Regions:
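N-terminal polyanion-binding entry modules of DNA glycosylases/AP lyases
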Residues: 1-106, 110, 165-189
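Catalytic DNA-binding helix-loop module of base-excision-repair DNA glycosylases/AP lyases
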Residues: 35, 107-151
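Alpha-helix N-cap/helix-initiation sites
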Residues: 41-45, 123, 140, 160
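Residue-identity detector for glycine
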Residues: 56, 77, 120, 143-146, ...
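Alpha-helix capping at helix-to-loop junctions
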Residues: 91-99, 117-120, 131, 135, ...
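Structural signal for membrane-spanning alpha-helices in multi-pass inner-membrane proteins
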Residues: 131, 153, 183-186
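C-terminal end-helix/capping segment
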Residues: 144-159, 164-168
Length: 189
């Protein structure tokens, strides 16, 4: 899959990633992505669990999220900005601004353009949705600090243009390359 010697070592060290199409739960995935922005996995999981608890056992509908008082959502541990972003995503579903069937057929760049129109969804979040929700095979997220750190650690590259050039050599499997680079940071041994 990769001619890159660094990635070849990582492929031998870690099990193959299992990317699953999770687009059936697109609202859930977007909300989870927003809550996870700029947080550790543990903190994000805690806040997300508190958020889910507000609605009982079943994940809320966009309408239920819009009906909930902002302060109740804030009490889960979200900033005012994140509460606003969560409501913005819910509103995009209620107003049918998000058409999942259409998004699934769009190019990666068109998906990014469409999703980033929604307050709170930037390029990084859209790229994570492409990789982990829509199972797109060839996404490289230069905006991801973890990926940049892994590239710096494993390749000694700090220049963004050089990182992009390196990632070009991983086409058409850049999503898989990203996954292995993330794993390299999680497991020090």
């Amino acid at each position: 899959m990769f001619n890159d010697p660094v990635l070849k070592k990582l492929v031998k060290k870690y099990p193959a990633p299992k990317f699953e199409d999770r687009s059936a739960n697109f609202f859930y995935e977007l909300i989870e992505s927003i809550i996870s922005q700029q947080l550790s996995i543990k903190a994000a999981d805690t806040i997300f669990a508190r958020f889910q608890t507000l609605f009982g056992k079943k994940f809320p509908t966009p309408t239920q999220v819009l009906a909930l008082d902002d302060e109740k959502i804030r009490a889960c541990g979200m900033s005012y900005a994140k509460v606003s972003y969560v409501k913005s995503v819910a509103n995009a579903f209620v107003s049918e601004l998000i058409d999942v069937a259409k998004i699934k057929k769009q190019s990666d760049e068109d998906v990014i353009a469409e999703l980033t129109q929604i307050k709170g969804i930037g390029r990084w979040t859209a790229e994570m949705i492409l990789i982990f929700t829509l199972k797109r095979p060839d996404v490289f997220s230069l905006g991801d600090l973890g990926l940049r750190n892994a590239i710096t650690k494993l390749y000694g590259i700090t220049d963004r243009k050089q990182m992009i050039a390196l990632a070009e050599t991983w086409k058409p499997y850049r999503s898989t390359a990203c996954w292995y680079l993330w794993r390299s940071l999680e497991n020090k041994g």
